[in-house]
From Swiss-Prot:
Entry GO MF terms: glutamate-5-semialdehyde dehydrogenase activity; NADP binding
Pathway of action: Amino-acid biosynthesis; L-proline biosynthesis; L-glutamate 5-semialdehyde from L-glutamate: step 2/2
Any single Gene Ontology cellular-component annotation: cytoplasm
Subcellular location: Cytoplasm
Family: Belongs to the gamma-glutamyl phosphate reductase family.
E.C. number: 1.2.1.41
Catalytic reaction equation(s): L-glutamate 5-semialdehyde + phosphate + NADP(+) = L-glutamyl 5-phosphate + NADPH + H(+)
Native species: Frankia casuarinae (strain DSM 45818 / CECT 9043 / HFP020203 / CcI3)
Identification of the protein by name: Gamma-glutamyl phosphate reductase
Gene giving rise to this polypeptide: proA
Tree of life domain: Bacteria
Biological role: Catalyzes the NADPH-dependent reduction of L-glutamate 5-phosphate into L-glutamate 5-semialdehyde and phosphate. The product spontaneously undergoes cyclization to form 1-pyrroline-5-carboxylate.
Length: 419
């Protein structure tokens, strides 16, 4: 039975009302709720793990791939990590009310731009139940109501988690409807959610390229794109090749299933003769299947010929595309054609080369002599993130608490009139 538009709209109406109640709450009130949520996850872990066990049994019965089953799995240690995440969010500064800029006008009127909550944040995501807790915590701390739509494979886990979070919110004096699951697990529920412009203030899809593309193309609610990562490492003619080798292997293999893992290596022709044999051997030793252009294939018989699909791929696996380029500008042209605007890295000892790369790469993050894996809210010192935006409006790069706010202009006068 398909989910009705009225059911989804009803949840959004309740979320809108909860957002209005949540917006003026103090940091102390919100932090108290976050800490209560963390404690409740541990206190009620048995029922959460029991619900998760049902999801896991259903996933295995359906023949779900092992990697997906792992993402779906909750353990006492993972629950403890989720609880710690909420405590860390509680320790972060509250962005609401922060003065972004301010001045006194010539007429004596005080003008300030301050941060305010977005309102109702809808998050559409795939199999990871931890996103339910992470998203709810970040939304609550930034004064927003969270309307959560996880995957059908995690419905029992997410239902149990949200019940625990809502109970802790109410016990702390906050509205229960500040955290809700979108009713229904069919595609109609998502379609209805995407049509609720005016009730839902923003949608944030987290998942694969297909999910993100569908939401961007079909939603009338404003969308922040996150996460698709075809990240590049460019080894310049003036690179420290030992450093380039270490950065390439780290960027590709440290954790392959994340959006800031490098998928393509570009090597300047001036150092290709020396560097390619070393890096190809290191990648093969790490279990990486290399897909290369003609020059790369000629160096190592284990290299597979690359196609356009490889240059465009977000592998999220032990695969890497490798090409030789004649110049920095050719590397940037390749990135602009095939990249996703996530993170690019240059390895070079040349300051002019690094500056040119920074100013010509059109990406959310650019690393100089560092791994692409650094693009992350925690590693940037921002705290937890709700995703990494690859678009240019409203936020770009890791999205922490400030990126879950908008701004209001406040003018303070003393009987000031316009003449």
């Amino acid at each position: 039975m398909s989910t009705s538009a009225e059911d989804v709209r009803g949840s959004a109406v309740r979320a809108k009302a909860a957002a209005a109640l949540l917006a003026p709450r103090s940091r102390a009130e919100k932090d108290r709720a976050l800490l209560a949520m963390a404690d409740a996850l541990i206190a009620r872990s048995a029922e959460i793990l029991a619900a998760n066990a049902e999801d896991l049994a259903a996933a295995r019965a359906a023949g779900t791939a092992g990697a997906m089953v792992d993402r779906l799995t909750l353990t006492p240690a993972r629950l403890a990590g989720m609880a710690d995440g909420l405590r860390q969010v509680a320790a972060l500064e509250d962005p609401v009310g922060e003065v972004v800029r301010g001045r006194v006008l010539p007429n004596g009127m005080e003008l300030r731009q301050i941060r305010v909550p977005l309102g109702v944040v809808g998050i559409i995501y795939e199999a990871r139940p931890n996103v339910t807790v992470d998203a709810a915590g970040l939304c609550l701390k930034s004064g927003n109501a969270a309307l959560l739509r996880g995957s059908a494979s995690a419905v029992r886990s997410n239902t149990a988690l949200v019940a625990v979070l809502r109970g802790a919110a109410v016990a702390s004096g906050l509205p229960a409807d500040a955290v809700q699951l979108v009713p229904g697990m069919d595609h109609d529920a998502v379609k209805h959610l995407m049509r609720l412009r005016g009730l839902v203030d923003v949608l944030i899809p987290r998942g694969g390229a297909g999910l993100i593309r569908a939401v961007v193309e079909e939603s009338t609610v404003p969308v922040i794109e996150t996460g698709v990562g075809n990240c590049h490492v460019y080894v310049d003619a003036e690179a420290d090749l030992d450093q380039a080798l270490a950065i390439t292997v780290n960027a590709k293999t440290q954790r392959v299933s994340v959006c800031n893992s490098a998928e393509t290596l570009l090597v300047h022709a001036g150092v290709a003769g020396e560097f390619l044999p070393r890096v190809l051997a290191a990648l093969h030793d790490a279990g990486v299947t290399v897909h290369g252009d003609e020059t790369v294939c000629a160096v190592d018989p284990r290299v597979l010929p690359a196609t356009d699909d490889d240059w465009a791929a977000e592998y999220l696996s032990l695969d890497m595309a490798v090409a030789v380029v004649d110049s920095l500008d050719d590397a940037v042209a390749h990135i602009r054609r095939w990249g996703s605007g996530h993170t690019e890295a240059i390895v070079t000892r040349s300051l002019p080369a690094s500056r040119r790369f920074i100013t010509t790469c059109d990406s959310a993050a650019v690393m100089v002599n560092a791994s692409t894996r650094f693009t992350d809210g925690e590693r940037f010192g921002m705290g937890a993130e709700i995703g990494i935006s690859t678009q240019k409006l409203h936020a770009r790069g890791p999205m922490g608490l400030p990126e879950l706010t908008s701004t209001t202009w406040v003018g303070v006068g003393d009987g000031h009139l316009v003449t």
